[in-house]
Structure formats: structure tokens, C-alpha cells
A protein has these predicted regions:
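A short beta-loop-alpha structural element at the N-terminal edge
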Residues: 5-17
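Long, charge-rich C-terminal accessory regions
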Residues: 171-280
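Conserved acetyl-CoA-binding loop-helix of GNAT-fold acetyltransferases
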Residues: 112-133
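A short helix-loop-beta-strand connector motif used in the catalytic cores of GNAT acetyltransferases and
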Residues: 27-37, 41
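Conserved acyl-donor/pantetheine-binding loop and adjacent beta-alpha core of acyl/acetyltransferases
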Residues: 57-104, 108, 184-185
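Short beta-strand-centered segments at strand-helix junctions
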Residues: 281-316
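Conserved beta-strand-loop-alpha-helix junction that forms the acyl-donor binding cleft
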Residues: 56, 101-110, 142-160, 215-216
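Conserved beta-strand in the GNAT
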Residues: 37-39, 45-58, 101
Length: 317
């Protein structure tokens, strides 16, 4: 029998997680980062296998400057000539500085079905939002900025980014993935100094580069769908290196975060038919679990062992 669990990541996970993605980290690790791992356990063999991971980073761009392109629009019109031209533009900036980010997303696509991948993403997203809800309650303050997630963009069969080849490579010739492996996470901040600061007209780019703006890599579409179901949307910003879209939402607009509550937990011997799946986070420690539970008044009745007396909880949905 397979059961799902959530835990924090550690040094022992690095090698496996690194094998899931060529991109690597988007930022330097900080003490307040939260690294979450979803794993499935074979209860008969008593073996746990990591399945997917993400990091929750606060204060994006405050320690290391981050840049994105804003995808905008300018209009050139001459009514007397009956001309009206709308042009898409790219303007580099730091609009998401201070945001909270869902970062370093990776999944074991080789061993999980699409349905299992989707479930793992839902589980991780709910766990991350529960942690944010608990922290906001403790601090009696709301973190500034939106919640964002930068998705990988399109690459051709040779592994090259058409967008980078059409724009960035004119200013820095090396492939972005190779550059990140050579120089680490700071290379994006450094390379931004070489890229144009003035608006770039998308019509000046090759067709393949234009077509890649805001498009998601096929292998990341499951993650995109999970973000959309959670309440995030495309925010008219893309990554510098591959034009992958940045999804965003104000924290107060996320249904899962608004539904998170601090609830008393009690144990029942068996879950009734109406019980649903809930994600629980212990009030005092970073201990999550997935449990079948029933909402009774303001409290939760949890089937099996109720290890927590008080927990932050949200329906899995």
C-alpha cells in the first residue's frame, strides 16, 4: 500500500533532487527558506521514496538582486493615415522584489504517473500555504508582496532556448544552463548588467523567440496546472533566460491560505464516509501529515492516531 507524506528536505536529498532537474537553484539558500519534500511510502516494505520537492523563499531579491522582463504593450497610431500598430515590449526590471516565491521545483517524472505528479504538487502547495498561514498568525503581520512561481520556458530539441538565442545570446553567448553550472545562482544577476535596460520590441526578435515568450516547457505543464488550481495566474512577467512565465497571486486572494485554520484535533477509531482528506501542520513544529478527517464545529476528528492536539489544517481539495 502506498501512502503520501510531507517533510522538510535535508542534505541527504540533494543528490536525488539534483538529478530531477538541470536548472538547479534559482537563489541562494537563506535561514528562513522552507524546503519541502513529498514522498510516498510502501507500508509493506517500510520504504520511503522522495517524489517531488519545492522551496518556499521569502523576500525574493532582497539578498541577491533578481530581474525579470515585464511583457507590455505600446501603440503607435496615426489617425490621419489610418494606422494603428500595437507592439509587444519587454522591459527588464525588479518588480517582484520582496515577494514570496515557490522555487526550486522538481519531480521524479520517471517513476510517477501524471496523476501522481499532480497529487504531489497539490500536496506540496497546500503544505507551503499552511506554513505561510501559521507564520502570518504568529507574526500578527502579513508578508509584503505577492506569491510567485517562475516556470521553465521552451527549449528546442537540442536543449537550446529559442528566446535566449534570439535576444540574450547577442549580449552573452553561453547557454544559460551551462552558465549557471559554471557560476552558480548569481550569474543571472550578473548577466542582467549586460542586457538592454530600455524596452525591447518583440517584433525585432526572430519568430521562434517571439513564440516562446510566456510559454511553459511541456514537462512543467502539470506544475502550471497545479498553480492555476491553487489560484495563481500569469502575471505578464517572464524569465530573462528562457521567457518562461511567472505566475503570481496576492496572498490574500488564495483560497487555500484563506481556508487554513488553527483547529483542535481529536481522534476517532475510523473515518466516517463523509470524511475528506486534510493537510495538517502541527502548531509547534514543522510536522505535516495527510489525514482523513471530518470537520465537527471548529474541530477536526481525525481517523487513527491524532498526534496533534492543535494543528493548522486545510482541505486537500
Amino acid at each position: 500500500m502506498k501512502t503520501w507524506h510531507i517533510r522538510t528536505g535535508g542534505a541527504g536529498d540533494l543528490a536525488l533532487v539534483s538529478s530531477w532537474t538541470p536548472q538547479g537553484s534559482l537563489g541562494e539558500d537563506a535561514p528562513d527558506d522552507l524546503w519541502l519534500v513529498a514522498e510516498w511510502r510502501d507500508t509493506l516494505a517500510n520504504v520511503a521514496t522522495p517524489a517531488a520537492t519545492l522551496k518556499l523563499r521569502r523576500g525574493v531579491g532582497m539578498r541577491q538582486v533578481r530581474h525579470w522582463y515585464h511583457v507590455g504593450c505600446v501603440v503607435h497610431a496615426a489617425p490621419e493615415l489610418q494606422l494603428f500598430h500595437r507592439q509587444s515590449t519587454l522591459l527588464m526590471g525588479n518588480d517582484y522584489t520582496g515577494a514570496t516565491e515557490l522555487s526550486d521545483v522538481a519531480c521524479d517524472t520517471g517513476h510517477l504517473t501524471l496523476a501522481e505528479q499532480a497529487f504531489a504538487w497539490r500536496l506540496l502547495l497546500q503544505a507551503a500555504l499552511l506554513h505561510l498561514a501559521r507564520d502570518r498568525d504568529r507574526a500578527r503581520a502579513r508578508p509584503a508582496g505577492p506569491l510567485i512561481a517562475e516556470l521553465p520556458g521552451l527549449r528546442d530539441p537540442a536543449g537550446q532556448s529559442p528566446f535566449w538565442q534570439g535576444l540574450g545570446a547577442h549580449f552573452y553567448a553561453e547557454d544559460p544552463l551551462q552558465a549557471q553550472r559554471r557560476f552558480g545562482v548569481r550569474w543571472r544577476s550578473d548577466v542582467a548588467a549586460l542586457l538592454p535596460r530600455h524596452p525591447v520590441y518583440a517584433s525585432f526578435l526572430p519568430p521562434a523567440a517571439r513564440a516562446a515568450i510566456g510559454q511553459v516547457a511541456p514537462e512543467a505543464r502539470g506544475w502550471r496546472d497545479a498553480l492555476v488550481q491553487t489560484g495563481l495566474h500569469y502575471g505578464q512577467h517572464v524569465a530573462l533566460h528562457d521567457a518562461g512565465p511567472v505566475f503570481e497571486s496576492h496572498l490574500d486572494a488564495l483560497p487555500a491560505l484563506l481556508a487554513a485554520r488553527r483547529r483542535p484535533v481529536s481522534r476517532v477509531a475510523a473515518a466516517p464516509e463523509r470524511a475528506g482528506w486534510w493537510v495538517l501542520l502541527d502548531e509547534r513544529s514543522d510536522a505535516w501529515r495527510l489525514a482523513r478527517a471530518t470537520l465537527v464545529g471548529e474541530g477536526l476528528q481525525v481517523a487513527g492516531d491524532a498526534g496533534e492536539r492543535i494543528a493548522w489544517a486545510v482541505p486537500l481539495g
